[in-house]
């Protein structure tokens, strides 16, 4: 054993000094991150929790948000899994792995629904906060910039707020990790030497809660 350690022999896969960031760069186009989100809703008998699923692809930072529900049963989750797989196919994306935490809402039937699409489930190991850092950061900003500022009174109300933020994030909001392009953009914007104030177009969502500025088309 001492000889093996002295010679630094390695068994199995070759190990190096790669970090988790290096690993994500290798598998960023096939490793999806998944998490449940809850949002209180005012009902006749008081506050109840609505739940929905957020799935994010680290390679492009593109995300997907499911409709909300009061009951996250296997039938509901199975439908959401099929929906996101269909959308991924339309965008020529290949979710080979879905990494999730050990939340009890992820039942065996949920895993079966995901695996039926051809993807494999990877569960969080204990005390590993960085394994799904991208999706958790998105959920944090979703709550801080949108959901925490809205009093939800119906499921359609919750869906509208979440999906407006989803559209803003995927198609409008610049992302530093993508050279300040939104996750849904595949090509950079046309470069201009100067931009006049009259060329800037302002738009908003949710009554001005989400703001967006862009250059008008030439």
Language-model regions: role of each:
Residues 1-218:
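Charged DNA-binding/catalytic regions of mobile-element recombinases
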């Amino acid at each position: 054993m001492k000889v093996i350690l002295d010679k630094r022999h390695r068994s199995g896969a070759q190990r190096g000094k790669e970090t988790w960031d290096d690993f994500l760069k290798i598998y960023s186009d096939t490793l999806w991150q998944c998490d449940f989100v809850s949002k209180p809703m005012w009902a006749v008998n008081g506050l109840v929790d609505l739940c929905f699923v957020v799935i994010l692809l680290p390679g492009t930072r593109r995300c997907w948000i499911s409709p909300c529900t009061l009951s996250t049963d296997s039938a509901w989750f199975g439908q959401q899994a099929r929906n996101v797989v269909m959308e991924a196919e339309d965008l020529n994306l290949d979710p080979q792995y879905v990494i999730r935490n050990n939340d009890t809402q992820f039942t065996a039937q949920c895993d079966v629904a995901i695996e039926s699409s051809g993807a494999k489930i990877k569960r969080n190991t204990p005390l590993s906060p960085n394994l799904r850092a991208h999706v958790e950061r998105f959920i944090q900003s979703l709550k801080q910039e949108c959901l925490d500022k809205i009093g939800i009174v119906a499921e359609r109300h919750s869906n509208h707020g979440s999906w407006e933020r989803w559209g803003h994030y995927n198609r409008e909001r610049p992302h530093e990790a993508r050279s300040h392009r939104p996750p849904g953009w595949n090509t950079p914007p046309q470069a201009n030497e100067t931009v006049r104030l009259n060329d800037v177009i302002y738009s908003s969502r949710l009554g001005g809660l989400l703001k967006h500025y862009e250059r008008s088309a030439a």
